[in-house]
Amino acid sequence: MRFSRSFDIDVENGYGKGMAEFHPATAGIHLPQAGPASSGEAIQRAAVLAEDLGYADVWVSDHLAVPTGADYPPSAYIFEPFIAMTWAAAYTKRVGLGTTVLVLPMRNPLSVAKIVASLDHMSGGRVILGIAAGWLEAEFNALGVPFAERGPRTDEAIEILRRVWTDDHITADFPVHDAHFVSMRTKPQPLRHVPLWIGGHADIALRRAIDVGDGWHGAFLSPEQTERRVKKLREGRPEQSFPISMRTRWDALEDDNDVILAEIDHYREIGVTHFVPEPRQRTLDGYLRAMEIQADLFRRASVSMFDS
């Protein structure tokens, strides 16, 4: 099923005027987990507001260690994602809880599986685990994890997660992680199939999403950059139950709202089905106000605020 809506957009930037067909879409919001506006109170208040406004889900980012220097601004230094998600879960009842994205190969997958299963249980089945192989070599070096092995480690970690979440007893060897399971019990298990949304923009990441993912989660790509990736993803995963998500830098309090509306239309026209904007506000009040305005823009764009 697709929706049609009349819209006026910038012809010079490659968009026409008139009727366009859109895929059904939902919307989440990134929590103030990093930067000047971030705090425990900020995460709590933003999560509660997101639920009140009808957002489908709330999202947090992941870095364990970030180098100093101009290339890594203060906004790169963030609260631990699982703690932030748990904090948000404690104050909400409905919104999904997502990672955008967890750098999976830096972590012990058995530990991740246990944490996610516990959070999924305690939150009532709300976790969306966005994962990727990572890109910051210095971060891997600080953790003593071989950067060159991040691809195979990601693939094997996904296998471990799925096995831990579904098998009552596991006997298996996982050579990349040098992990050996002999009739291991790994309770609790999630309440349901935890969706794995695969992040990354390279062809190998798209192939991973097609082969083993439950969705794809991109970040900060323009509609033009996104289009070829959506085509490739839909060639392998044509079903509409496979979400194509995009994290954006939209700040509805600062940015031209007409431009945001036009970009929503353009993304939807090429097949994006979920949005995660991240306001750039430096104060909590500004962040919350940006969330309110963005929610109104999604409604104006006929984006469902949550998937019922």
Give, region by region, the residue ranges found by the protein language model.
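Active-site mouth loops of central-metabolism enzymes
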Residues: 29-41, 100-110, 190-201, 247-258
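Catalytic-face loop-and-helix region of soluble metabolic enzyme cores
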Residues: 230, 234-255, 270-273
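Catalytic domains of carbohydrate-active enzymes, especially glycoside hydrolases
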Residues: 45-61, 210-215, 266-273
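N-terminal beta1-alpha1-beta2 module of alpha/beta enzyme domains
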Residues: 1-91, 189-194, 285, 292-301, ...
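Short, acidic/polar
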Residues: 38-50, 115, 198-208, 255-266
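Internal, glycine-rich beta/alpha segment that forms the wall or movable "lid"
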Residues: 10-23, 66-72, 86, 99, ...
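Hydrophobic faces of well-ordered beta-strands that scaffold small-molecule active sites
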Residues: 5, 27-31, 58-60, 97-99, ...
